[in-house]
Amino acid sequence: MSETATWQPSASIPNLLKRAAIMAEIRRFFADRGVLEVETPCMSQATVTDIHLFPFETRFVGPGHSQGINLYLMTSPEYHMKRLLAAGCGPVFQLCRSFRNEEMGRHHNPEFTMLEWYRPHYDMYRLMNEVDDLLQQVLDCQPAESLSYQQAFLRHLEIDPLSADKTQLREAAAKLDLSNIADTEEDRDTLLQLLFTMGVEPHIGKEKPTFIYHFPASQASLAQISTEDHRVAERFEVYYKGIELANGFHELTDAREQQQRFEQDNRKRAARGLPQQPIDQNLLDALAAGLPDCSGVALGVDRLVMLALGAESLADVIAFTVDRA
């Protein structure tokens, strides 16, 4: 959109009408499949420990809390939705605001709309198929292709990400003229992410959506480790036309293992000079009480709408981006 007074919306009114139609289409998709729409809090007393996520923090002062308590805007509704699953709600979805205190640009806004849903008794592959169904319906695109993380690296970088050591990863980075970053990086997963971002992403999802699945176990986050290959996690991401659209897991249900991962994240944070984050005990208690075997996925709605409309930037499909908020 051309430069206008900042009181005006960044997106055109016709685009906002099309966005509303897509939101309605998403709701029909899940209603037709018997998936319950839910609403969960935008704030929590705990937050994510992932070293790559940066939440907004605020402080509540009120009756019973005269000294104030810290609250965090949710980076995704995942933890609350899993508590609903543990309480027996069955399959659920949510369209909600999420917040990340990170970059802004063509594909990023600190406040954004997330579509997240969970399917009890679905494995990773069955959920991938459902994501594919939704993308075909909203984007009118071809059926997606799928590549394992290992296959993607071998095809585009000629290196095995599951066995390569840091020296080999740095050599691969040098071929991409990334030595200035890679040579001083000691974290193997950061090196892998650098190679994936610069050496794999530009080549996938050009003509049709591409699922990348079986990420390294060290990048499992809240996903289960594969029982068939302990080197990989039951995790997938979806890419289309240069954009990461979604991130999904066959969800970890073991409370003790999840706590260990949170604690490991905080140790990594401390080593990098980042603040350690409060662990969500309510989530751990829900896992201990019994999270059903399930798979879940988070999808960026603003990016989906941008692709559906052939727009150049999130600003073309969001009423007011942060610089106009």
UniProtKB/Swiss-Prot annotation:
Matching InterPro entries: Aa-tRNA-synt_II, aa-tRNA-synth_II, aa-tRNA-synth_II/BPL/LPL, EpmA, Lys-tRNA-synth_II_C
Organism: Salmonella typhi
Database matches in Gene3D superfamilies: Bira Bifunctional Protein, Domain 2
Enzyme Commission number(s): 6.3.2.-
Gene: epmA
Protein name: Elongation factor P--(R)-beta-lysine ligase
Pfam families cross-referenced by the UniProt entry: tRNA-synt_2
Catalytic activity, as annotated: D-beta-lysine + L-lysyl-[protein] + ATP = N(6)-((3R)-3,6-diaminohexanoyl)-L-lysyl-[protein] + AMP + diphosphate + H(+)
Role noted for this protein: With EpmB is involved in the beta-lysylation step of the post-translational modification of translation elongation factor P (EF-P) on 'Lys-34'. Catalyzes the ATP-dependent activation of (R)-beta-lysine produced by EpmB, forming a lysyl-adenylate, from which the beta-lysyl moiety is then transferred to the epsilon-amino group of EF-P 'Lys-34'.
